Amino acid sequence: MSLLLLVVSALHILILILLFVATLDKSWWTLPGKESLNLWYDCTWNSDNKTWACSNVSENGWLKAVQVLMVLSLILCCLSFILFMFQLYTMRRGGLFYATGFCQLCTSVAVFTGALIYAIHAEEILADRPSGGSFGYCFALAWVAFPLALASGIIYIHLRKRE
C-alpha cells in the first residue's frame, strides 16, 4: 500500500510540475528567428546582449480563455494534492478518495479545454504575427499533462484507504 501511495503522490507531483512549466514557461508557439510566444509574453532573443526581450501578448479573447483555464488547472491540481494529503491522514480505513479524484478529473478537463482552444484558435491568437512557426514544448507539455491528470483522477476514485 505504501508503494502505491508513493507512486500516486509522485504522479501527482509530476503533473504539477508539467502544469507549472506549461503555464509559466515561454514556448507555446515558436516562430523562425528565435522568437517564441507563451500565454503571457511575446519574447525575442537578443543575440547582442544574450537576453530575452519580452512584451505583453495580444488581448485576444481566446488567449484569455486559455490563460484562465491553465491557471484554473494549476489551482485545481494543487487543491487536489492538498485534499489528498488531508484525506490520507484524516479519513477512516476503507474510505475512498472521491473528492481528490473529482478535483483531478476537473484538472484534466481544464487542461484539455485550454490546449484544445489554443490549437483550434491558433490562427486568431497569432493573427498579428508573421506566418510560419509551430507549437512549442509548453503546448506539448499541456497535452502530456492531460492524460496523466485523467489517469490520476481515475486512480484516486478507485483508491481505497487501507492500514
Swiss-Prot record:
PROSITE patterns in the cross-refs: PMP22_1 (PS01221), PMP22_2 (PS01222)
Role according to the record: Probably involved in cell proliferation and cell-cell interactions.
Annotated GO biological process: apoptotic process; bleb assembly
Keyword Oxidoreductase tagged: no
Protein's name according to its UniProt entry: Epithelial membrane protein 3
Gene3D superfamilies membership: 1.20.140.150
Gene: EMP3
Primary localisation category: membrane
